[in-house]
């Protein structure tokens, strides 16, 4: 009978937990979509933002470089507790002001300033929300949040191109003016959709993060003795047993509230002041070094390869128009090829970035370089097609332009670009999944006898060390976030001369379609 009553008591908690998980997924999906959609809209609007004699690569450069600087520099310079609420507010204001500046300006310089502000917001947003996934109370909820974020960023590619396609008829002022309302959903989602973290804990049977005792647990258990908290210099005394311990659990998104959204008590703030942890520059460098080869180089390589394909090779993948079959319905003009390759790529990036959300297992850590290896193969084959028409039949190899029918290489290129999108999305979501798990288990910091490297016992793990471990997780995922932007920047420098060289090669062989677009 008691078991039945206990089951009935737990039923509302389980139902509430499932609802909280849905809110968590929706919130991070929206965060990912909002953070990347303006980036895509700006790239899609590049032709309308600059004059005909201005290289379109200027827009791409100003759209990525500020984000890269933010993601490289900020994790190294910032210190102490991350104030997530303030960061979300900064991203909202910066993104809105940037897009409004672009919309209301008619000359190049202020538009580039607006693009830079939007890029700065995008870089800070990715850094912030990836770090936020490491603060969730369980491994399962962190995985849910990361999967939703990745799905949102993947869908932003399709959504951004579609939004600008619908709004471009309104012009830059009207189309981007309407788009400026999108950043306002950041604070709305953060405040009203993202659930209190305490509602998420019943959703998982195990948690890699140790929860601090709450005031309610202390008051309801007279025999409970809170763990002694060792305070370093200037005092080596234990904190008295009656010292308040974070009255409602984990510290949430800034230092003034806990994860239930309640104001911290004066005792909580005093305790936080005594145990404030910071990562020194030396500690950050020590954390960063193993990440470079393990995570950053493979992710950077994937991004270099896929953006070289998108910006340097894909514009030259143009074929004689097919006269029958499915391709003849899609390609009515040579200008239709590049948008179709872009849509294909974005669609399969979205699918692969959603792999965790779809319940697919992550690839093992040792196989993280695999997407970059496959991507290099895809790049090589597409380069050969653009350079030598490697897959084309003799009837479609220049100087011949075919005599009706369909060039078989169109289908092969389509399949290769599908694989490109799958590799790019897989590299992103799996890299950040494994980075988020680095250092997530407190037990991994102890030897077989239960002692850590500082000589402490697992049973007396102090609050300062726990907070420092959390900061290390936030730093790791934030630092690795610079790898993708670095790859895009390198790719942009490679792509511009590569596209020119490939087009010149095609013209020399007798096919001038790339020049006529």
UniProtKB/Swiss-Prot annotation:
It is a multi-pass membrane protein. The keyword Disulfide bond does not apply. It is found in: Vacuole membrane. The chain crosses the membrane at residues 24-44, 57-77, 88-108, 112-132, 146-166, 169-189, 371-391, 409-429. One of its GO terms (cellular component) is cell division site. It comes from the Eukaryota. Keywords: Amino-acid transport, Membrane, Transmembrane, Transmembrane helix, Transport, Vacuole. One of its GO terms (biological process) is amino acid transport. Its main location: membrane. Pfam families: CLN3. Belongs to the battenin family. Involved in vacuolar transport and vacuole pH homeostasis. Also required for cytokinesis. This is Protein BTN1. It comes from Cryptococcus neoformans var. neoformans serotype D (strain B-3501A) (Filobasidiella neoformans). The gene is BTN1.
């Amino acid at each position: 009978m008691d078991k039945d009553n206990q089951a009935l008591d737990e039923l509302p908690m389980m139902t509430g937990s499932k609802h909280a998980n849905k809110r968590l997924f929706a919130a991070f999906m929206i965060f990912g979509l909002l953070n990347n959609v303006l980036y895509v809209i700006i790239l899609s609007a590049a032709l309308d933002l600059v004059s005909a004699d201005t290289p379109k690569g200027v827009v791409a450069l100003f759209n990525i470089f500020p984000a890269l600087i933010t993601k490289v520099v900020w994790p190294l310079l910032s210190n102490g507790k991350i104030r997530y609420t303030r960061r979300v507010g900064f991203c909202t204001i910066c993104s809105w002001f940037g897009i409004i500046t672009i919309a209301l300006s008619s000359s190049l310089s202020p538009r580039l300033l607006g693009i830079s502000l939007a890029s700065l917001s995008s870089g800070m947003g990715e850094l912030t929300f990836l770090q936020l996934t490491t603060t969730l109370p369980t491994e399962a909820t962190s995985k849910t949040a990361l999967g939703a974020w990745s799905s949102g960023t993947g869908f932003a590619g399709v959504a951004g191109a579609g939004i600008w396609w619908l709004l471009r008829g309104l012009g830059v002022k009207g189309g981007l003016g309407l788009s400026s309302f999108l950043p306002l959903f950041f604070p709305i989602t953060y405040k009203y959709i993202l659930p209190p973290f305490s509602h998420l804990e019943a959703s998982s049977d195990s948690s890699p993060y140790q929860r601090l005792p709450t005031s309610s647990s202390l008051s309801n258990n007279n025999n409970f003795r809170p763990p002694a908290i060792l305070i370093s210099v200037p005092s080596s005394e234990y904190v008295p047993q009656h010292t308040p311990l974070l009255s409602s659990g984990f510290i949430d998104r800034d230092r003034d509230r806990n994860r239930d959204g309640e104001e911290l008590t004066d005792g909580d703030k005093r305790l936080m002041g005594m145990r404030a942890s910071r990562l020194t520059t030396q500690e950050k460098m020590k954390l960063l070094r193993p990440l470079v080869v393990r995570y950053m180089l493979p992710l950077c390589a994937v991004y270099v390869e896929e953006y070289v394909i998108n910006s340097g090779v894909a514009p030259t993948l143009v074929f004689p128009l097919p006269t029958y079959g499915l391709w003849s319905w899609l390609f009515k003009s040579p200008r239709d090829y590049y948008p179709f390759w872009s849509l294909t790529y974005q669609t399969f990036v979205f699918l692969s970035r959603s792999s965790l959300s779809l319940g697919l297992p992550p690839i093992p850590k040792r196989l993280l370089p695999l997407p970059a290896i496959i991507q290099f193969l895809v790049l090589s084959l597409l380069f050969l097609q653009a350079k030598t028409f490697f897959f084309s039949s003799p009837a479609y190899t220049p100087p011949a332009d075919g005599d009706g029918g369909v060039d078989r290489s169109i289908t092969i290129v389509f399949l290769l670009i599908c694989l490109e999108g799958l590799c790019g999305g897989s590299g992103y979501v799996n890299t950040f999944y494994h980075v988020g798990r680095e250092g997530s288990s407190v037990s991994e910091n102890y030897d077989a006898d239960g002692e850590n490297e500082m000589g402490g016992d697992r049973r007396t793990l102090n609050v300062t060390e726990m907070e420092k471990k959390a900061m290390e997780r936030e730093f790791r995922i934030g630092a690795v976030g610079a790898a993708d932007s670095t790859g895009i920047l390198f790719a942009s420098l490679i792509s511009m001369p590569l596209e020119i060289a490939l087009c010149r090669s095609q013209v020399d062989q007798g096919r001038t379609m790339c020049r006529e677009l």
